[in-house]
Amino acid sequence: ASNLNLSKNWYCSILGCSLGRQTVEWIDFNFFGHQLVVHLVPANEEKVFTNRVDGEKVSSRHFGVILTHNEWKKLVNRLQEKNLKFTIQPQTRFSGKAGEQSTFFIEDPFENGLEFKAFQNDDDIFSV
């Protein structure tokens, strides 16, 4: 990120993450029970590429987290209340197949894609 204060505000205020350790060069967040580290870097001028997944254009530069269905629905409601733009609207992907999941994508202020998903069956998380 090219602005750590903007990152801190966005991840805490929009997503509800809590702060961990921080310096003038990086910030740790509690990202839904996982450590997310945002580092200070010069403004990125790279084009963000996409690939098709189940008919949707997905940012090739993204990361994600698996939530329970209840957590996923609460986060969808929180983001809708904050009028956050979804890059991929909340939906069900791979319906009726192994890996069926509720998913949506958003971007942070630096165009990093974030995917949030909840699987219909947790045994399918890494099935092929």
Enumerate the predicted regions with their spans.
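A short local loop/turn or secondary-structure capping micro-motif enriched for an aromatic residue
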Residues: V37-V38, N44-V48, N121-I125
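Vicinal oxygen chelate
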Residues: A1-S2, N30, T50-V128
